[in-house]
A protein has these predicted regions:
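A short, polar/proline- and glycine-enriched secondary-structure boundary/capping micro-motif
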Residues: 32, 63-67
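Structured core elements
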Residues: 5-6, 20, 43, 53-55, ...
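Substrate-binding/catalytic subdomain of NAD(P)-dependent oxidoreductase enzymes
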Residues: 1-34, 39-41
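Short acidic (Asp/Glu) and glycine-rich catalytic loops that position anionic groups and cofactors
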Residues: 45-52, 99-100
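A conserved regulatory-domain signal marking ACT and ACT-like small-molecule sensing domains
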Residues: 67, 72-186
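Glycine-rich phosphate/pyrophosphate-binding beta-alpha loops
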Residues: 50-52, 56-63
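A broadly conserved detector of short glycine/acidic/proline-rich loop/turn motifs that flank catalytic sites
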Residues: 8-10, 25, 48, 58, ...
């Protein structure tokens, strides 16, 4: 299963800065999925230390006071730090549409023949492969509806947005598709 988490993700790949914050699904076996309450967690991956996980208090009066005090100290010695810095390599910030990853999709549709093939056809056109699919009866008093849940293999976010735009305009779609990014730490 998965757990919903608000993650900030920063990576540097080929001189591009990847820096996003969004709610996503995380496998419930991952350490980061178990971080709750006043705690924050950080996963650091590098060529040298592989994967490290850090957890500590990040909310509440004492952690907040510590952060504020740290910011004041950093600000007060900023001028001295600026003089000691070497040149920083400039990296290009990446657009979220360039993200690659898995997705959870929930479609609300009329329950009729051809719905699943209509959805999968649009996914196929955009090079998106399904990992799993489940269909349940939907809730509607006017017509027979279905809820279709799909998880995908890794794909390009730009392709996913193009596919969802087309799918949401299909005549059997009852409401806009719900999508949540899935973050894999393997």
């Amino acid at each position: 299963g998965y757990k919903v988490k608000l993650l900030g993700i920063t990576q540097i790949r080929k001189k591009n800065l990847i820096n996003f914050v969004y709610p996503c699904l995380v496998d419930h076996n991952e350490l980061i999925s178990k971080v709750d309450g006043v705690f924050n967690g950080i996963i650091v991956e590098s060529d040298f230390c592989k994967k490290s996980f850090f957890q500590g208090e990040g909310a509440g009066s004492q952690p907040t006071a510590t952060s504020v005090l740290s910011d004041i100290i950093d600000f007060s010695i900023k001028e001295r730090k600026e003089k000691s810095k070497s040149k920083i390599n400039i990296v290009k910030n990446t657009n979220i549409l360039d993200r690659s990853g898995s997705f959870y999709l929930r479609f609300s549709t009329v329950d009729q023949p051809g719905v699943i093939s209509g959805i999968t056809n649009e996914l196929k056109k955009n090079n998106i492969s399904m990992k799993s699919m489940l269909q349940k009866d939907g809730i509607s008093k006017e017509k027979k509806c279905a809820t279709i849940v799909v998880t995908t293999h890794n794909c390009n976010e730009k392709d996913m947005m193009k596919a969802l735009k087309k799918i949401n305009n299909l005549n059997f779609v009852v409401k806009k598709t719900t999508f949540i990014r899935i973050e894999n730490f393997k």
